[in-house]
């Protein structure tokens, strides 16, 4: 899918439509010090198998895109709804 590098959309911080720069964001590594991760490590300790049953069905073939829109006026970034699944993604100059 081809997506423009710049797009005119609503900025929730300026409260008006401005030109936004589109950025694709990569996922950061999961924090090992978060409360949930510490709890999970505690459950895994000791003898026995994995504490949860295997998930049913197969894994999705493609991850969802994480797009950030950076306002050229105020410089703040925001997302626009939820991400969508796409196999190939390319930012192009329009």
UniProtKB/Swiss-Prot annotation:
InterPro entries: Ribosomal_eL44 (IPR000552), Ribosomal_LSU_eL42 (IPR053708), Ribosomal_zn-bd (IPR011332). Keywords: Metal-binding, Ribonucleoprotein, Ribosomal protein, RNA-binding, rRNA-binding, Zinc, Zinc-finger. A zinc finger (C4-type) spans 11-74. One of its GO terms (molecular function) is structural constituent of ribosome. Binds 1 zinc ion per subunit. Its cofactor is Zn(2+). It holds the Pfam family Ribosomal_L44. It comes from the Archaea. GO terms for biological process: translation. Zn(2+) binds at residues 11, 14, 71, 74. Binds to the 23S rRNA. Belongs to the eukaryotic ribosomal protein eL42 family. This is Large ribosomal subunit protein eL42. The gene is rpl44e.
């Amino acid at each position: 899918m081809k997506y423009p590098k710049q797009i005119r959309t609503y900025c929730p911080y300026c409260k008006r439509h401005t030109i936004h720069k589109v950025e694709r964001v990569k996922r950061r590594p999961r924090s090992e010090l978060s409360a949930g991760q510490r709890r999970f490590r505690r459950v895994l300790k000791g003898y026995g198998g994995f504490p949860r049953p295997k998930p049913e069905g197969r894994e999705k073939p493609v991850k969802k895109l994480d797009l950030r829109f950076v306002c050229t006026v105020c410089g703040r970034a925001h997302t626009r709804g939820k991400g969508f699944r796409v196999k190939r993604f390319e930012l192009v100059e329009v």
